[in-house]
Amino acid sequence: MRSVLSLALLAANVVTAAVVSPFDYSGYKVIRVPTQKDNVKEVQRIITDLNLDTWKYPKSEGQNADIVVPPSQITSFMERISGMSMEMMHEDLGMSISNETSFEAYSAGYAPDINWFKSYHSYQDHISYLQDLQGLFRTRSEYVDAGKSHEGRTIPALHIWGSGGKNSKPAIIFHGTIHAREWITTMVTEYLAWSLLSQYNKNADITSIVDNFDIWVFPIVNPDGFAFTQTSNRLWRKNRQPNPNARCPGRDLNRNYPYQWVGPGSSSNPCSDTYRGAQPGDGTEIKVHIANMKRIASYHGIAMFVDWHSYGQLFMSPYGYSCTARPPTDARHQELSRIFAQALRAVHGTPYRTGPICNTIYQVNGDSVDYALEVLKVKLSLTAELRDTGARGFVLPADQIVPSGEETLAGTVAMLKAVIRG
């Protein structure tokens, strides 16, 4: 990582470090174009003709197109969308990234507190933080090296338990950062872990949750991709595993799970952001996570799995692979999704939509939620798209971390209380 450290120490025992990405997004714009029946095909053509990247691709009418436009294409793009509604998400994406990646470097050994959540952080600082956080609560938690990524990085996990000791209750599993550029998910899953540990025996609801479940938090499911977003390209999505006979590396790990692997919700093109891989479950990190989930399930089963993503402000249930099929537990999934969204909104007024993945966001093949439910027989399998709805998208300012954590914790606590009640 290339970084520049300030000379002044801050009050929270941190220093400011500006991380510069070799891919320069200066002058790039991110523009939202809402689609409807009379323009969706034209918007799709514009994206194809100008070879533009998208944060959100409009697969059907009514969906927003969030489009990344390089300086060389701005004039042509604006001419092509003349007469259409549009919203500027990032006037200068390079400037937005520069502001977001002014990290506060963590001092190893520093007692973790709310200050951690005032900034985004490097991969290695996340490892130090998780180890230090666990060190404060040694009798009811453990830091786990859950396995290695394709490039040999640790996939970290925190294991949290209450009365009865570890591996004595049904498990809750939280996944974050399976998509590398979704930095807010790293911070929010760590906020959940910090809250569950620090508020145990202080907050009755959190104490009850920790006493009723064995909790596993995996904040960085895709460490190679995450590190790559900090050193090379902030908007990278996939892992970094090479693809034989292809110039583009990486698999979309959330299209690589070995269940309903082939379909319109994934791609066979190695250069696509939704490339499913050469074989079901051939992603190095997916092999690690499947092995971990099977091991965790072998104790007392898995009560709930939640895969945290961004962006869109959605809380969703199975299925991703089909827009018509519903699991037998659909009503319960929908009930818990509504409980989560209502409790979350009560904190800062942030609205979330709920519903099955395929109907709420888009069709997805080979995803974690469907795999967990149907193959691992997890009782409740859910996924979230955290803040925001597109004003900033993947490049979410650091001042959104704490409110995102606060509201997500409230939604999660309310949902798990409902699970305990039955």
UniProtKB/Swiss-Prot annotation:
GO terms for cellular component: extracellular region. The active site is at E385. Residues 18-112 form a propeptide. GO terms for molecular function: metallocarboxypeptidase activity; zinc ion binding. Residues 119-419 form the Peptidase M14 domain. Belongs to the peptidase M14 family. Binds 1 zinc ion per subunit. Keywords: Carboxypeptidase, Disulfide bond, Hydrolase, Metal-binding, Metalloprotease, Protease, Secreted, Signal, Virulence, Zinc, Zymogen. Extracellular metalloprotease that contributes to pathogenicity. The lineage of its organism: Eukaryota, Fungi, Dikarya, Ascomycota, Pezizomycotina. Its cofactor is Zn(2+). This is Metallocarboxypeptidase A. Disulfide bonds join C248-C271. Its EC number is 3.4.17.-. GO terms for biological process: proteolysis. The gene is MCPA. It is an enzyme of class 3 (hydrolase). Residues 1-17 form the signal peptide. Gene3D superfamilies: Metallocarboxypeptidase-like, Zn peptidases.
